[in-house]
Amino acid sequence: FAEESIYMAAYSLYKDSPNFNLDQTGTLSAINELQSYLNNYPDSKYREDCTIMIKDLRKKLEKKAYEKAKLYYKTSPFNIASLKSAVIEITNFQRDFPDSDYNEEMAYFKVVSQYDLAKSTVEYKQKERFEEVLKFYLEFIDKYPQSTYLKTAEKWYTDSQNEVTRIAKIEAEYKALQEKEKSNTSKIATSPQ
């Protein structure tokens, strides 16, 4: 009797779980209760039902996280904070839902968001951020070599390579100029007057 009561309480939380676009506190509670039930009654006749419900609830959390990351991606062209947030949310999504059907799209969005961030950022941070684009692109093609997004992602990769090369050249020229000035300064300081 107690087992059935606990199952029914967990089941009612499952039924009460809100749509993905709403706060998911109830969904998390339902998952916890269903998992607790399975842990306490591993041989229950409701085992399969609980497993199916947990998968269904996790799909809801996945959809919520996907839509959140996608929203940051869509709003990201408007400001640098949104670009950073898009990359962070996409990274969190990939970590939390490694087997998601949305991961190919998310990996592409991550490349684009990081590229836009690198282009929009202050000069002294650009090289590092373009190098991140290169890293994200390589992760993308490693996982999705046949992706429909491949051609577009290649453009961001090539542009990023060119930017890293351009910035490295500027840095080398600046360093050479500093060395030359330092050398000239020391010659002036050591020359007899």
What are these regions (language model features)?
Residues 1-193:
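Acidic, polar-rich low-complexity tracts and alpha-helical solenoid repeat scaffolds
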